[in-house]
């Protein structure tokens, strides 16, 4: 199988190339915090020589509770993204939830993301594809890895072949997720070699059946990330926060920002080791 390479500016995203860190915060809480988080990621990735794309949401439209914080909204969020790009020279990835958001968001950010809960919505998929932007497709928790090929086909039929796939865990009964390590290879095959990345922090989610917000297992973020990197993937999708216990969204799954450098050191070492091995054909 031939691995496809998707370019985000001068960054190559491919399963056989050095991993790309798609990292940032879950939702934009403030301009100042976004600057703080992005600055730390840039400092660490520049020091370690890891390709980097900043991630955050301007609107968490799928929060469980009507009372939960959603974000600053598209207009203010795009202003923050523009400032981050100007200040730090970073590429940016952000999700869209409505068709009307696709074009204005694609004019500012470098990658638009299709949320897991919306990945089967054909009208939204087509609108995103027609922007011509790089698209990151989150695998729905309820969808098998092999079905991701159908979503890729929808995008490609619109003339856009710049597709990245992202695993963020699979339903394991009610209110829990598990990561199928075999699924990464299945997605590569189903998509004919699209880059596959791993959203480790969202894969740590779990919840109280009657609760209004997701819980998480951030104490296990390193071990789960190590396992995903060992498969040989194009990138890691990570959320970090200066104070996870007081984050406005998904704090229980977020890596403490102070632990970022040590974490990335380990991920880079695993990625380099795995990709130094010759490919073995064990299918015969």
Curated annotation (Swiss-Prot):
HAMAP family in the record: KDO8P_synth (MF_00056)
Keywords per UniProt: Cytoplasm, Lipopolysaccharide biosynthesis, Transferase
GO biological process, one term: keto-3-deoxy-D-manno-octulosonic acid biosynthetic process
GO molecular-function terms, A-Z: 3-deoxy-8-phosphooctulonate synthase activity
Gene Ontology cellular component list: cytoplasm
The protein's name in its UniProt record: 2-dehydro-3-deoxyphosphooctonate aldolase
Cellular localization per UniProt: Cytoplasm
Pfam families: DAHP_synth_1 (PF00793)
Family from the record: Belongs to the KdsA family.
Catalytic activity of the protein: D-arabinose 5-phosphate + phosphoenolpyruvate + H2O = 3-deoxy-alpha-D-manno-2-octulosonate-8-phosphate + phosphate
Keyword Cytoplasm included in the entry's annotation: yes
EC number: 2.5.1.55
NCBIfam families, alphabetized: KDO8P_synth, PRK05198.1, PRK12457.1
Pathway: Carbohydrate biosynthesis; 3-deoxy-D-manno-octulosonate biosynthesis; 3-deoxy-D-manno-octulosonate from D-ribulose 5-phosphate: step 2/3; Bacterial outer membrane biogenesis; lipopolysaccharide biosynthesis
Main location: cytoplasm
Domain of life: Bacteria
Record carries keyword Transferase: yes
Gene3D superfamilies: Aldolase class I
